[in-house]
């Protein structure tokens, strides 16, 4: 069964807009798990524009499901992850000026770099995932880095699905199939929503985990956080039947 990890960056963005501690990220993480969320995802950036590095240490004791930290493996990020020891780290090639993640790794071009980083995390007992575009040509190199998983960057699927182009799922299916054949588990995330999650997982039932933040928090404004999480879980369950 595909697991739902809730990305709480958007909650941190709301908090930071006023400079205080409302909404409280720790309380939000506790509630998300009580409501059925099967993991908590955060994506700290060096400028701390949403998740602050201190948030990682505050959240670690209360995440009783799975803690997934995403980010570009610069020195400060690596130190943060090694000190906090989440269940999973997802490596993302963030551009400094990017509003949000907008591309996966070129695992061929950055093979040596990724291999060294992944070795460090795996020696610390941390499961490692590589953020990847839906490109089968990048899968073999991803597997050879020593990574445990890939996370499919699903923005293009979400955009095309919204336009009615269901064939946009095909490169994701091909990439996921090849990843599994190469011994990698497959996660997915970015712009997945209540509108498209069921179709995506039905077409790729091997997905181990989805990480959803922006859409889920936005939908929760209308439906409530508990109702929204439960709605995702129902759609995932139906898709996995």
Residue ranges and their predicted role:
Residues 1-86, 167:
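Conserved N-terminal beta1-alpha1 strand-loop-helix module at the mouth
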Residues 2-8, 40-42, 67-69, 89-91, ...:
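Hydrophobic faces of well-ordered beta-strands that scaffold small-molecule active sites
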Residues 36-38, 62-64, 83-89, 123, ...:
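Glycine-enriched alpha-helix->loop->beta-strand junction motifs that scaffold or abut catalytic
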Residues 49-75, 109-129, 165-188, 194, ...:
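Alpha-helix-loop-beta-strand connector modules within alpha/beta enzyme cores
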Residues 60, 103, 164, 219-241:
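C-terminal helical cap(s) of enzyme catalytic domains, especially alpha/beta-barrels
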Residues 75-84, 135-145, 188, 192-207:
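Catalytic cores of alpha/beta
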Residues 91-98, 149-161, 205-225:
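Glycine-rich phosphate-binding active-site loops on the catalytic face of alpha/beta enzymes
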Residues 127-179:
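Histidine/lysine/aspartate-rich catalytic loop segments that bind and position anionic ligands
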């Amino acid at each position: 069964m595909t697991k739902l990890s809730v990305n709480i960056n958007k909650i941190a963005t709301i908090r930071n807009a006023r400079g205080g501690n409302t909404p409280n990220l720790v309380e939000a993480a506790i509630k998300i798990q009580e409501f059925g969320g099967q993991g908590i995802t955060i994506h700290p950036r060096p400028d701390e524009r949403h998740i602050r590095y201190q948030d990682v240490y505050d959240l670690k004791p209360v995440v009783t499901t799975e803690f997934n930290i995403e980010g570009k493996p610069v020195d400060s990020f690596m130190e943060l992850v090694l000190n906090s020891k989440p269940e999973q780290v997802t490596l993302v090639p963030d551009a400094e000026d990017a509003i949000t993640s907008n591309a996966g790794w070129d695992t061929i071009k950055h093979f040596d770099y990724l291999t060294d980083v992944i070795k460090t995390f795996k020696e610390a007992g941390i499961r490692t995932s590589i953020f990847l575009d839906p490109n089968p040509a990048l899968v073999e190199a991803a597997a050879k880095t020593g990574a445990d998983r890939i996370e499919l960057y699903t923005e293009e699927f979400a955009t095309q699905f919204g336009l009615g182009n269901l064939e946009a799922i095909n490169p994701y299916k091909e990439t996921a199939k090849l990843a599994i054949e190469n011994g990698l588990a497959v996660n997915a995330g970015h712009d997945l929503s209540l509108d498209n999650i069921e179709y995506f997982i039905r077409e790729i039932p091997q997905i181990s985990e989805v990480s959803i933040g922006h859409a889920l928090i936005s939908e929760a404004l209308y439906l409530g956080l508990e109702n929204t999480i439960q709605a995702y879980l129902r759609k995932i369950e139906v898709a996995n039947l």
